[in-house]
Design a protein with these regions (language model features):
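Short S/T/G/P-rich N-terminal loop/turn motif that feeds into the first structured element of a domain
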Residues: 3-65, 73-83, 106-110
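Flexible, gly/pro- and Lys/Arg-enriched active-site loops
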Residues: 91
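Non-catalytic beta-sheet/beta-sandwich ligand-binding modules that flank or precede catalytic cores
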Residues: 99
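Short, conserved active-site loop motifs that form the nucleotide-linked donor/cofactor pocket
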Residues: 102
Length: 110
C-alpha cells in the first residue's frame, strides 16, 4: 500500500515469500524429509521463480527449525502459488502434519 501511495506500481514488482517452521519432531530425519517435501515444489509449481530451504544450526530457544524462501513474479503469482494443487495437496498437507508453529512474511522486491 505504501509503495502504491508513493507511485510505485506494486503489480509489476516481484514478491518474496518467507516461512519459518518449528517442527513437532526435531529429528534430523524429519527435518531432512520436510526439506525434501518443500524443495519438491521446484518444477512442479509453475509460479516459483526461485526456491531455497534452510535448516537452523543454532538450535536456540527462539530458533525455528526450517526456513522456506520463494521468489515469485508478482502478487498474483503469490495467490496462484498459494492455491496451486501440488502446493495444497502435497506440501501444505505435510506441513500441517509436522509443524508445531510457523510465521510468514511476504514482501515486494524492488
Amino acid at each position: 500500500i505504501i509503495l502504491s501511495i508513493i507511485g510505485i506500481k506494486t503489480e509489476a514488482l516481484m514478491v518474496r515469500h518467507i516461512v519459518l517452521f518449528k517442527l513437532k519432531d526435531k529429528s534430523e530425519e524429519n527435518i531432512n524429509k520436510t526439506a525434501e517435501v518443500l524443495l519438491s515444489m521446484k518444477g512442479k509449481v509453475p509460479q516459483i521463480r526461485g526456491i531455497e530451504v534452510g535448516r537452523d544450526f543454532l538450535h536456540s530457544e527462539r530458533s525455528y527449525d526450517i526456513g522456506l524462501t520463494v521468489t515469485l513474479d508478482d502478487a498474483k503469482a503469490l495467490d496462484d502459488y498459494q492455491n496451486d494443487p501440488y502446493h495444497c495437496e502435497v506440501v501444505k498437507k505435510h506441513m500441517h502434519a509436522v509443524r508445531e508453529s510457523s510465521v510468514a512474511i511476504d514482501y515486494y522486491i524492488d
